[in-house]
Amino acid sequence: MFLSCLYTNSRYAIYGYISQKSQTTSIYNKSKKTKEKVKKEEYQGDSTIVYQNPKEINISGSDTNNLIYIYLESIENTFLDTENGGIKNVNCLPELTELAKQNTNFSNTDQLGGALPFTGTTWTIASMTSQFTGLPLKVEVANDMDQQNRFMPGAKTIGDILDENGYIQELMIGSQKEFAGTDKLFLQHGFDKISDINSLKEQYLIKNDDLNQWGLKDYKLFELAKNELTELSQKGKFNFTMATIDCHMPKGFLCKYCPNTYENRYENIYACQSKLINSFIDWCKSQSWYENTTIVLVGDHPTMAQQYVNDVPSDYQRTTYNCFINSKVTTDQKKNRQFTHMDMYPTTLAAMGFNIEGNKLALGTNLFSELPTIIEKYGQDYINEEVQKSSEYLDKNIYQFN
């Protein structure tokens, strides 16, 4: 029981959350937008605003890209070699390293790096939610959103915005769509279709060797994704979102393509992921729609396979991987940033070519802009404490639990 409690706390940071929950926060209180006297196209935004309601913001774009967004299960920068920002002698993610170097990687250091772990973002459905909505998922919810009728009905998400702009949207996962309310999160916020293990079994020939205990192995998922994308791309502008699974705790899932050259099982699975993802990106590059498609790769959370991160030095900051391919905007402010998964929301839209009034959506800040993120402005400890407190605004207007 004691070990179970320790694991639960390490996964959801629930002890600190409970201690703060009796207090209330004012960070979601309506802030008056202040605009400097500059041309509209030059306005960067107000860095003092913590929360910006996306429903009150003008988001526009006439020549925006398609989107491929891939949540990478448990992919963190720790498994890079020391030369590139990890702790390993041999790089477990060589292909992903090169992709990050050749494209845009936002980093917390002057090497490759990524988003900092943050309350309400550090397990899969919470990570998806934070990147999708710019808000943390309430810790006490954990994976129980399948018990709710609606998934944050008051939130305006990436899916809602792309739906308003005529995008056809599909989520493809190798597990069951109902787990943790994944189906509700996406289908209730602009998505047209979810392809999961059950629907894929009906549509394609799936062999037993293609399966693990969660559902479809990633090599098969990427194989079938090519078919889904080919069909989707013929319908107009699209958002194709995926989530991998092979690096899931407690020890990951080996497949027939995994090498046996690294120190342990998990590192071999990591190396396999790097090759699979890179191969999929290479396929994308050969398609007619590639030049008009932004691809975003993001680790969903640091791994929970604790036995494989016991060697992490106490002074090393674990972060999740990110890479923006074919972004329509650039920035020279990519290194030594302090940001969370909530910042992926406006940053992704900006990468696609959308103009975001004030560069802030929910608790997220567009990393391509000149604005500091909320944790750069106010400090991670302060913002972390505030989001753990109760908020009548969020409960009434965003979460609206049963």
Tell me what each language-model feature is.
Residues M1-T25:
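Transmembrane and membrane-interface helices of multi-pass
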Residues S19, Q23-E56:
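Short coil-to-helix leader/linker segments, especially the first N-terminal amphipathic alpha-helix
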Residues D46-N402:
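Solvent-exposed soluble domains appended to multi-pass membrane proteins
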